[in-house]
């Protein structure tokens, strides 16, 4: 069986969620499957995070734009190398492609009503491209994979896809996310002192950055400790806008924004955090939830979409539209030591249910099922 895997962006330096998912899937398949042939199609970049092996061939395709790479370069290369199945891993796929397709559709947020907040040019272009592409490829996909039961039911309901063509495969997390020796000081590259709140906010409205910062402002007014807030992926201009709109100038001197945090440093960041805030309005899965829990860091997360499914019913679940609820749980973790220790243990046990090996095993089984349906009838 020859399997093509679209992994366009995994060689870029600053990777994001979907990039890490396909990268870990490839690495696990590379270790566990020496029988089938894999052709991994990527765009050239500075981070060569996976190399070719005997049966895994990394093919670099140079093309100026994402749509052109996916719609023209990818199907031509897949045909050239004679793949039996082409797995497109990041929500979209080539419209004109005669090779049987498997699609990972992480979410359908792009089909849901948009809020009135400003979006970046990159976000707008991605939104329009997905809205154009996805409706045109769904009927051509032999299987559509998604990453949580919440998202699967959402996709089936809104896109009217037969259940038998859907597959739910949970993501995993890397095994270096674990409790670490207290002596490490790598966190100091980003923030001077440990015991901070950690938040991966950005400009995407679904990340709920503005409301979370309002909650943090309320926390600072009520707390005797006044812990710092470490935030990644947010620039000063965007922060200034939030502060001015909400009149929360008291947060300025307590927020640390180092910019992009290298993935290899994240285990140290989680370990030295007092708690992790994952208060999104909407997520299809939430790998950072698992990473924090696996490090023994208490998590405050939302009671919406997939987050209760991933974090578990015993996790700290709040209404993400209520800054008061977020503040309340920040303070409770700080004041109630028994509750704090209980949440650490709950997270450690919950994280054990997920792994990239389990993800890859289910993915390989799906490839085999699709191949049998097509070629062994």
Question: Where do the model's predicted regions map?
Answer:
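Carbohydrate transferase catalytic cores enriched for Leloir-type hexosyltransferases
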Residues: 1-377
């Amino acid at each position: 069986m020859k399997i093509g895997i679209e992994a366009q962006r995994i060689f870029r330096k600053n990777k994001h969620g979907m990039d890490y998912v396909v990268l870990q899937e490839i690495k696990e398949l590379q270790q566990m499957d020496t029988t089938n042939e894999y052709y991994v199609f990527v765009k050239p970049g500075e981070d060569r995070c996976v190399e070719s092996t005997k049966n895994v061939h990394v093919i670099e395709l140079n093309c100026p734009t994402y749509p052109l790479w996916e719609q023209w370069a990818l199907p031509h290369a897949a045909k050239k190398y004679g793949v039996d199945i082409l797995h497109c891993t990041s929500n979209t796929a080539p419209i004109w492609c005669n090779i049987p397709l498997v699609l990972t559709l992480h979410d359908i947020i792009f089909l849901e009503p948009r809020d009135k907040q400003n979006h970046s040019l990159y976000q707008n272009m991605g939104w329009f491209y997905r809205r154009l592409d996805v409706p045109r490829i769904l009927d051509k996909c032999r299987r559509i994979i998604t990453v949580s039961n919440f998202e699967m039911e959402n996709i089936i309901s809104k896109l009217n896809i037969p259940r038998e063509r859907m597959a739910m495969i949970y993501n995993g997390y890397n095994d270096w996310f674990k409790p670490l020796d207290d002596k490490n000081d790598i966190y100091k590259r980003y923030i001077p002192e440990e015991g901070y709140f950690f938040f991966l906010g950005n400009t995407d409205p679904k990340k709920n950055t503005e409301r979370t910062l309002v909650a943090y402002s309320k926390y600072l007014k009520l707390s005797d400790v006044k812990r710092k807030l470490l935030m990644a992926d947010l620039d000063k201009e965007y922060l200034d806008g939030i502060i001015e709109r909400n009149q929360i100038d008291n947060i300025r001197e307590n927020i640390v924004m180092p910019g992009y945090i290298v993935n290899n440093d994240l285990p140290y960041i989680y370990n030295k955090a007092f708690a992790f805030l994952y208060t999104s309005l909407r997520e299809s899965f939430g790998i950072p939830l698992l990473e924090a829990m696996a490090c023994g860091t208490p998590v405050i997360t939302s009671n919406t979409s997939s987050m209760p499914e991933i974090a578990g019913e015993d996790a700290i679940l709040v209404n993400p539209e209520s800054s008061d609820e977020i503040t309340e749980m920040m303070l409770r973790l700080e004041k109630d030591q028994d509750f704090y220790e209980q949440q650490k243990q709950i997270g450690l046990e919950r994280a054990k249910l997920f792994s990239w090996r389990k993800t890859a095993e289910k993915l390989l089984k799906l490839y085999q099922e699709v191949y049998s349906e097509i070629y062994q009838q």
